[in-house]
A protein has these predicted regions:
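A residue-level signal for conserved active-site and pocket-lining positions in enzyme catalytic cores
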Residues: 35, 112, 140, 194, ...
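A general alpha-helix detector
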Residues: 31-37, 76, 296, 300, ...
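Basic, amphipathic alpha-helical segments enriched in Lys/Arg and hydrophobic/aromatic residues
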Residues: 299-378
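An anionic, glycine-rich sequence signature occurring as long contiguous blocks
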Residues: 193-303
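Dynamic "connector" segments at or just before major functional cores
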Residues: 1-111, 116-121, 133-145, 159, ...
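Polybasic low-complexity intrinsically disordered regions
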Residues: 99-193, 199
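Generic secondary-structure signature for well-ordered alpha-helical cores
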Residues: 86, 98, 163, 214, ...
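Short acidic (Asp/Glu) and glycine-rich catalytic loops that position anionic groups and cofactors
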Residues: 14, 189, 277-281, 292-294, ...
Length: 378
């Protein structure tokens, strides 16, 4: 059996510092990290399940790991991940994903946050961890992630994560939490373009854009018209219509110079009909993109929504992230990174037509397929 792919993982984790004192190092750190990644790919969600996977696959694991004292106990896995420096693991993770990500003009990088709901520790006053991720739509890869104590700290985490990534010629999309002048400026200074949803509590900006589109979606204003596109999706007893209007008419906004490179305003309307009821929602965006038609802009907006469907949903449903109880030290944050790495590898494999759950089962049952999944990281 080809073991080059598993051995490559040893090199991936080479830069991670071991937090243990020498006398407690019965097991190699790289062994612990690689076993955990393989186990998570194969369906393990808890430290007990990681240990069970290790003993079930111990002969195969010995073909590329040292395992001087066999498989570590579930307590050992938990202790090591609780003490492991999250920044070290993130640095290795980011170097790997950025090497794989397509560096092409127009690629979309979506920033969004997700709370690991059961990572809180009420007894010790520890809030649930909120992970901010950067998602590349073209590769369906998580490019990087940072942890914050709560959702409100996304405003601080986004610039920090952005500074670590290459967004040259990329379109960076962020929801309303990230609609900040400093963030827009940083994206442009790093060579990217921005498409930011406007917050409702940004009264002057939000209300002025709303007033403009309330009229512009009905009739031209002084000869100015908006580019328009409409998509209709029907199925499962519902009909969803998405309409988008874009305009590069920005002269009316007196503070436009405060937003670096501002060139266009966007209005997206979602109309949903289900069970005899209709709901309509409008969202507004600002962007430094120009010369694009409404259809292209809607593609970018919908591309941002994909982070919810293709990343957050998979972590909740396939990896049960919101039900898991890793609370001690850095264990929740570090294991979250392992789950995202596993998801990246599983998504990159195109040889199996099953969904993520099916691929995890296939990897557990067939070592050849597990090696194939691991090879997607080489």
């Amino acid at each position: 059996m080809d073991v080059e792919a598993p051995r490559a993982l040893l090199r991936l984790f080479d830069g991670v510092d071991d937090p243990r004192v020498e006398r407690t190092k019965l097991h190699h750190l790289t062994d612990i990290l690689v076993i955990t990644l393989c186990a998570v790919i194969c369906g393990a969600d808890t430290w007990t399940e990681v240990e069970l996977f290790g003993w079930a696959k111990v002969e195969w694991l010995r073909t590329f790991l040292a395992l001087p004292h066999g498989i570590p106990s579930h307590d050992t896995f938990g202790r090591v991940f609780a003490r492991l420096n999250p920044d070290e693991l993130e640095r290795c993770f980011r170097a790997w994903t950025q090497a794989l990500a397509t560096a092409s003009g127009g690629r979309l990088v979506a920033f969004d946050g997700k709370t690991i709901r059961r990572s809180f520790d009420k007894a010790n006053g520890k809030a649930a961890i909120h992970m901010v991720s950067a998602w590349c739509r073209a590769n369906r890869l998580v490019l990087g992630q940072l942890a914050t104590d709560e959702k409100s700290n996304e405003i601080k985490a986004i610039p920090q994560l952005l500074a670590l990534l290459d967004v040259t010629d990329a379109v960076v999309t962020i929801d309303a939490m990230g609609c900040q002048k400093a963030i827009a400026r940083q994206i442009v200074e790093q060579g990217g373009h921005y498409l930011l949803q406007v917050k409702k509590n940004q009264d002057t900006l939000h209300d002025r854009i709303k007033e403009t589109f309330d009229e512009l979606t009905v009739r031209p204003i002084g000869g100015v018209t908006a580019s328009f596109h409409e998509d209709v999706d029907a199925g499962h007893g519902r009909v969803e219509t998405r309409r988008i209007w874009t305009t590069e008419w920005t002269d009316w906004y007196a503070q436009r110079g405060e937003w670096t490179g501002l060139r266009s305003f966007v209005c997206v309307e979602s109309e949903r009909m289900a069970n005899g009821q209709t709901s309509i929602d409008r969202r507004y965006y600002i962007s430094d993109l120009g010369g694009l038609d409404a259809r292209t802009m809607l593609d970018y907006v919908r591309g941002h929504w994909a982070i919810e469907n293709q990343l957050h949903w998979s972590l909740d449903v396939s990896f049960r992230e919101d039900t898991l109880r890793q609370r001690v030290g850095h264990s929740a944050e570090n294991l979250s990174r392992i789950r995202r790495l596993a998801l990246n590898l599983l998504r990159r494999d195109k040889t199996c037509r099953a969904g993520i759950n099916g691929k995890r089962l296939q990897a557990c049952l067939k070592e050849d397929y597990l090696v194939r999944v691991l090879s997607r990281g080489i």
